[in-house]
Regions:
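N-terminal presequence-like segments and the immediate start of the first folded domain
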Residues: 1-256, 260-280, 285-331
Length: 331
């Protein structure tokens, strides 16, 4: 049976070595294996994503709850729940519904309906993996079409989402993969508090020049456990991409944005003023794999040796952005 949520431990993330042939621990809600050649354990809680790891040994991103978990399926949604948290995931073939916008709308309507009918009504964090995310011109660019489908789903299933606060989220591009949209998320019985970045226009308020529908996510969420979940963050000030072609400057600007979110969360007493440490996780998506060594060196210079870092090859939502970074930090 799921554990008693009144005695819940904090939700937590880690990067762990791949252990084939061994079952996951009973408190694992979700595990994400990256790379087409990395084996995925035979466990429903394991999701395989075709983004290549760029540094170090293959590893699994593991999200742990309070355990033991119960797994199940509801329509297209697979899930694991522990009494306090729920992890869900689904995939949908674009061809089955026509195009990416329609596939995204269908996927999000399914997951939002599932969450509305479950006791875990509050979605804290979402990840979206989109094939060829930068393909297409103008409003036909695939990321813009993804945003259109997502916005339509929120409007249909959760009209008050902006007032409540959109979940923190990332959307990155897979390369050379079948056109299958993959979405996973973490939800809870307890609401989180969304945090916006004073250096940036909120994504859901972007002007029309970025597409027919604004991206519907918040810059960060702080959970009821004081876990700061920073969305995929890049070199954007206001709503404008900065430092085109300059990776070092983009990294600098990205960390200014992450620091601003940490500072706001601390100022509002949502988290304690603690630095990133061995209990935090940092994931960086890098457009050009040949930059992996220099980026790893720079991240270590900034973060020190103890902060777990995962570097993945991926396309970023805007074609002029070279890197995107997300963080989970227990404050």
């Amino acid at each position: 049976m799921p554990a008693d949520p009144t005695t819940a431990l904090p939700l937590r993330a880690s990067y762990e070595a791949v252990k084939t042939g061994r079952p996951f621990d009973e408190d694992v809600l979700l595990s994400v294996v990256f790379g087409s050649h990395t084996p995925c354990p035979d466990d429903q809680r394991c999701l395989h994503i075709d983004l290549a790891p760029l540094a170090g040994a293959a590893c699994i991103e593991v999200w742990r709850g309070i355990g033991p978990v119960r797994v199940g399926t509801a329509g297209q949604v697979r899930y694991a729940e522990d009494g306090a948290h729920c992890a869900g995931w689904l995939s949908i073939e674009e061809e089955a519904v026509g195009n990416l916008a329609d596939a995204t709308q269908a996927a999000y309507r399914s997951l939002l309906r599932f969450q509305a009918e479950s006791p875990y009504r509050h979605v804290w964090r979402m990840w979206n993996y989109v094939a060829d995310i930068n393909a297409g011109e103008g409003d036909e660019e695939r990321y813009r079409q993804f945003c259109l489908g997502r916005a339509r789903a929120f409007a249909a299933e959760m009209a008050d989402a902006q007032a409540i606060g959109y979940p923190a989220a990332s959307a990155v591009g897979k390369r050379g993969s079948a056109r299958t949209l993959e979405v996973c998320w973490i939800a809870s019985r307890s609401p989180g508090i969304t945090v916006e970045n004073p250096r940036q226009v909120s994504a859901f308020e972007y002007p029309r020049e970025y597409g027919p529908a604004s991206p519907t996510f918040s810059r960060a969420t702080v959970t009821s456990d004081r876990l700061l979940l920073v969305s995929g963050t890049a070199s954007i000030v206001g709503h404008i991409s900065m430092h085109a072609g300059n990776l070092a400057a983009q990294i600098e600007e990205t960390f200014r944005n992450i620091d601003a979110l940490v500072e706001r969360s601390t100022a509002e007493r949502l988290i304690k003023p603690t630095p990133l440490d061995q209990h935090s996780t940092v994931k960086a998506y890098l457009r050009d794999a040949s930059d992996a060594a220099s980026v790893t060196q720079e991240l270590r210079r900034r973060l020190g040796p103890s902060v777990p870092v995962l570097l993945l090859a991926a396309d970023i939502c805007r074609s002029d952005l070279l890197i995107e970074i997300e963080v989970a930090h227990q404050g």
